Amino acid sequence: MASEPRAGPVMPMASLGPGGPAVSRVGLGLAALGRPAYITGGRGRDLPDRDVNALRARTFAVLDAAYAAGVRYVDAARSYGRAEEFLAGWLARPGHPGVVAGSKWGYRYTGEWRLDAGQHEVKEHSLAMFGAQLAESRALLGGRLALYQVHSLTTSTAPTPASRITRAASATVCS
């Protein structure tokens, strides 16, 4: 396990919208760390061991380095495999004040931790998917989840009108 992270100088901060949380202007996305095959395909020399424990340890080390460099915003998504789980484990360790966690819904991870999976995610923007994925994200990240975004919503992929999703999100997130 990585050593206790040292807090370096915090980067300049910015608000995520009016009244939103203050975050570092540079954030860290966990897409390539939360699942064994994504943009890391063909990177066997850089990531020789891709089992769950190895990628969890790698995620913790990267998060420790980012925190020491002043990064205070971390982005995950339900489709990033175990990214939320890894982030939650790292946040549970002492020494990470001021970290803002964000996540996204709209894709379901289907790769089952296999490098050779033909399909790694399925896009779905239904109200049912929103509710299920928000509950999963909250179960993992709890009160540290400060921003929840839709992943790649377009008029052609949204079976539910955006206004209904917006109302559901407002009612769910604000309650």
What residue ranges belong to the model's regions?
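General helical structural elements
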Residues: 60, 108, 168-171
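N-terminal binding-site loop/beta-alpha segment at the start of enzyme catalytic domains
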Residues: 1-104
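Acidic-and-aromatic substrate-binding clefts and catalytic sites of carbohydrate-active enzymes
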Residues: 77-85, 109, 154-159
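Short acidic/His/Gly/Ser-rich catalytic and metal-binding motifs that mark active-site loops
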Residues: 34-40, 109-113, 157-159
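N-terminal entry module detector
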Residues: 86, 91, 100-132, 136-138
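Glycine/proline-rich, positively charged
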Residues: 44-50, 117-175
